Amino acid sequence: MSLQKSKTRFGAVVMKRWSRKLNRIIARTAAVFLAFLAIFAYNTNNAKAESVNVSAASAIVLEASTGRVLYEKNAYEKMPMASTTKVMTALVALDYGNLNDVVTVSKNASGVEGSSIWLSAGEKMTLSDMLYGLMLASGNDAAVAIAEHVGGSLDGFVELMNKKAQEIGAYNTHFANPNGLPAEGHYTTAFDLALICARAMQNENFCEIVKTQYKTLPWEGHEWDRVVKNKNKILWNYEGGNGIKTGYTKEAGKCLTAAAQRDSMQLVSVVLSAPDMFNDCMALMDYGFENYKNRVIMEAGEYIGDVTVEDGTEDRFSVYTDKDIMYPLTDTEYEQIKRRVHLEEKVKAPVSMGQLVGTIDLWLGENRLYSVELKAAYQIGKNSYEFNLNRLLKFWMNGRMLDM
């Protein structure tokens, strides 16, 4: 063997030994915060069997951010929903329309029966103002004008409504019009409608509209403006009330979707065919706030474990959570939360940013609440001769400087 080859081989052995030592030193301080994705399946099995005194034929209250059902009564029975339909009308309009668009009222829209904001054929109004007229005063004329503008036609808009219902998971809902007037094939369930409302309450523009008590709207051809008042008494009469929509037809009876937020918990309640609809929704939300709290079941910065890296520029990295996970629980349930961690013991370099390295499942009894994906927050490269040489030189230089 030549002298040059011998030196090269000796250098490689030294590099490898020093590299292992350096990897161990560096790994003691290397910590990777992992991005995680919480996958939540709607859980309706834990709704309390206790009775809440409501007049409604169908009722439900759920926590909006998780979709957890806190109480329900006949919540999966298909029923007409009157003007609570307009929650979906507004949501679709916000998804597909532009708030600054100018809507021209058709003769068809101006002639719709029932509650209205007194639109005239040919009148022009921004989509934003039209939505206030829809959700505060429950204008059937506004519903048709919005639908024709955003969907191109009533049929086109209704198709978008039904598509959105499927996206949300409201599988037992079907719309036949944008205003909720009686029609064949127009129905929902209290559960589905609560899901729709929960989704709508995630939209900032929607929330701003439905929490408004009074709104002044322009009125073409008149010396004064329209002033519309929100029909939802929850805004005045219930602590934290912040939405959302009333409804009534002879066929559907009195219907109400109501929302309230206290601290970090946003509740949505729905009652269908409810003679005492406001008191019903307040009783449902009272039950939710009195029995449940939105609790942190996994905190940001919690240490989960270590993952070994084979042939990497680092020997291992530590796994931490990077955000809080909250869930509505009773005091008793909070003590029953269990975790099941599934973490890779070893991964081979290179490690890509976002690479899946494990999961955490959070359980309440036999119900899995969340499955959290643990992903590498940054890249870890593959070991190489050049990398080891550079690290050895830096380590050697640092050592010499300390000796000086």
Where are these regions (language model features)?
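Domain-terminus/edge residues, biased toward the C-terminal soluble/receptor-binding domains
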Residues: 170-171, 182-187, 191-404
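N-terminal secretory signal peptides that target proteins for export/translocation
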Residues: 1-23
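A generic local structural motif
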Residues: 13, 19-22, 35, 47, ...
